[in-house]
Each structure stands twice: as structure tokens, then as C-alpha cells.
Amino acid sequence: MEYYAVPIAKLVEEFQKLPGIGHKSAQRLAFHVINLPMEKVQKLSESILEAKQKTRYCSVCSNLTDIDPCPLCSGTSRDKTVICVVQDPRDVVAMERTREFKGLYHVLHGAISPMQGIGPEEIRIKELITRLGSGDVKEVILATNPNVEGEATAMYISKLIKPLGVKATRIAHGIPVGGDLEYADEVTLAKALEGRREI
């Protein structure tokens, strides 16, 4: 039995539906919102509604945007001969934070996972192949996650694009910067050895 008002209990319940938010965190968030001044609560609710209403998928790369095509696709300074394929819009943010990649992106919104009933048709592979039909793209960097689903997706895509004459590369996996070899598992060490480069 909960010891607080029904509207607070409803708010806790809604917060708990968010990923990574358990009961205690949901309770903390609910009480924080209740204690905010009314104008801050209003701003928060307006921001949530605006984000939901105005955000859509870019018609070119499938990234989240409020402008179509997105600024990355319409930017004139990007290298349009290279596309980095990622699973999730958050991966684009991570790649952009490195300030190293200057090409374009393609967001799949998932990975092939037969165990979860997700096949190639359920993610945006067809749209990628359509983009490659223009002939402008010379390389596709497969930056899917380094797990079974990500590897399967990368292999599937590489086989599809090989006949198109587009170079397929895979991001290297291995030891994180500052990590100790003794704590790395065998798979990570093997991937680090595979992905080694000349210095």
C-alpha cells in the first residue's frame, strides 16, 4: 500500500515506465516535480509535448530531427562519399561527440535478432540500399554494436552492398583507453588483436 495521494501514485507509476527507472527513482522524480514551482512544471510538460510532436525521422538518414532533411544530411561540409551505419539515434550523438567522423549517417533503428523476431525487413536496411543506389557513396562504415545481433546485422549488410561496389568496413573493437589487459575478456582481446593497425 502506498502512503501518498493518488495523483502522486499515478505520476510515480508513469515515471516507472521509463527505461532504467525503478520504483525508488520514480518516487524521487515524482516528489521533485511536485515540489517545483508551477511555471517550471509547465515548462517541463511543454518541453515533453513539443519534443514528441515536433521530432520525426529524417527522410534521408532516419535520424531523429525537427527539420527534414536533418542538418547532418543537408550540411555542405559533410563527406557524402562515406556513410556510417548505426543502430540507434543515440549512436549518432556518440559518434558526433568524437568530432572525428565527417561523413553521413544511416540509422537502422535496431539490429537483426531472430530470437526477438526482428528480421532485416523490420529495420531500415532497405532504405540504406536505396541510398547507395545513387553511386555517390564509396564506403559504408558498419558501426553496429559489438554483440551477436550487431555482428549479424553488419555481416548481412556487408553481403548486400558488396555487389554494389561499395567498400564495407567495420569499426574496430577492443580495449578501452585506460583499461588494463588483465581485466579484458578473451573476446575483447581477440577483437583488439584483429583490429590492430600499423604505427
UniProtKB/Swiss-Prot annotation:
A family per Pfam: Toprim_4
A single GO BP: DNA recombination
Residue pairs linked by disulfide bridges in the UniProt entry: none
Start-end of C4-type zinc fingers: 58-73
GO molecular function annotation: DNA binding; zinc ion binding
Keywords: DNA damage, DNA recombination, DNA repair, Metal-binding, Zinc, Zinc-finger
Function description: May play a role in DNA repair. It seems to be involved in an RecBC-independent recombinational process of DNA repair. It may act with RecF and RecO.
Listed name of the protein: Recombination protein RecR
Species assigned in the record: Ruminiclostridium cellulolyticum (strain ATCC 35319 / DSM 5812 / JCM 6584 / H10)
Upper classification of the organism: Bacteria, Bacillati, Bacillota, Clostridia, Eubacteriales
Gene label: recR
